[in-house]
Swiss-Prot record:
Homotetramer. The keyword Cell membrane does not apply. Pathway: Fermentation; pyruvate fermentation to lactate; (S)-lactate from pyruvate: step 1/1. GO terms for biological process: glycolytic process; lactate metabolic process. The active site is at residue 179. HAMAP family: Lactate_dehydrog. Belongs to the LDH/MDH superfamily. LDH family. Catalyzes the conversion of lactate to pyruvate (Potential). Appears to be the primary factor that allows S.aureus growth during nitrosative stress in both aerobically and anaerobically cultured cells. GO terms for molecular function: L-lactate dehydrogenase activity. NAD(+) binds at residues 17, 38, 43, 69, 83-84, 105, 122-124, 147. It comes from Staphylococcus aureus (strain JH9). This is L-lactate dehydrogenase 1. Pfam families: Ldh_1_C (PF02866), Ldh_1_N (PF00056).
Length: 317
């Protein structure tokens, strides 16, 4: 039974990621109503005007307005992009203490409005902050989603598509684990235009080194972009829009998001990037890909990395 009826999104955090996400929603007419909240109310005012001026060219009418936490009471989806930004040379996990404090305040304000929808978390370190949102909100695990490795998987598919000269949508390959340095590719189930990657590499052995380099490029892409222009935002904004679309269209789409594991992949009590079925009620279920021994070992290491960080976080004790 689908609980939610409308398509109202409240966006908290109107920085580079948040404003790019807002534009993606309006451009694609994914929502009926978009409310934007940020401490910088003047920037929100300007962005709301700018987005409204774009709506005559969007496929359908989208209502856009500046708001406050009380607007969350009837929202279907609250998307959190607020938090301290990642600095050059700083890992996503370095951000944890600063952003946990911010999230405790944000989630408390949202829940005080009697919010009863779905949370979508984008702020880094996203796996830990999705877990924190679940803990702070008291909502069922199905209704707290992190953006996880949706962007990493997109980068991975793009680079593989370029290597094999096919469209990215013809590549089925996932990055799982932490959205960060311990993420891993699921080579054992990757396929290009329906052909197993393993089979293709047997036909062109020289491609093995290229494939390994593709993962390195995928993993380190954010650092390269941050070094070049200070932040990444277009890719993750489109990923967030894709998750939003899957929710509101009740798609049962499989996307690599950060979800709570309760025995899947032999892990417990951790939010981490895995394939999951997304529909109007949030996460329907986690999809367990049979990993080979090496992949399982790397995934366990990734989960342990996140758990070790959370164990040190005073805000989660």
């Amino acid at each position: 039974m689908n609980k939610f009826k409308g398509n109202k999104v409240v966006l908290i955090g109107n920085g580079a990621v948040g404003s790019s996400y807002a534009f993606s929603l309006v451009n694609q007419s994914i929502v009926d109503e978009l409310v934007i909240i940020d401490l910088d109310t003047e920037k929100v005012r300007g962005d709301v005007m700018d987005l409204k001026h774009a709506t005559p060219y969007s496929p359908t009418t989208v209502r856009v307005k500046a708001g406050e936490y009380s607007d969350c009471h009837d929202a279907d989806l609250v998307v959190i992009c607020a938090g301290a930004a990642q600095k050059p040379g700083e890992t996503r996990l370095d951000l944890v203490s600063k952003n946990l404090k911010i999230f405790k305040s944000i989630v408390g304000e949202v829940m005080a409005s009697k919010f009863d929808g779905i949370f979508l978390v984008a702020t880094n370190p996203v796996d830990i902050l999705a877990y924190a949102t679940w803990k702070f909100s008291g909502l069922p695990k199905e209704r707290v989603i992190g953006s996880g490795t949706i962007l990493d998987s997109a980068r991975f598919r793009l680079l593989l598509s370029e290597a094999f000269d096919v469209a990215p949508r013809s590549v089925d390959a996932q990055i799982i684990g932490e959205h960060g340095d311990t993420e891993l590719p699921v080579w054992s189930h990757a396929n290009i235009a329906g052909q197993p990657l393993k089979t293709l590499l047997e036909q062109r052995p020289e491609g093995k080194a290229q494939i390994e380099q593709i993962f390195v490029q995928t993993r380190d892409a954010a650092y390269d972009i941050i070094q070049a222009k200070g932040a990444t935002y277009y890719g993750v904004a489109m990923g967030l829009a894709r998750i939003t679309e899957a929710i509101f269209r009740n798609e049962d789409a499989v996307l690599t998001v950060s979800a709570l594991l309760e025995g899947e992949y032999d892990e417990e009590d951790v939010y981490i990037g895995v394939p999951a079925v997304i529909n109007r009620n949030g996460i329907r279920n986690v999809v367990e890909i049979p990993l080979n021994d090496e992949e399982q070992s790397k995934f366990a290491h990734s989960a342990k990395t996140l758990k070790d960080i959370m164990a040190e976080a005073e805000e989660l004790k």
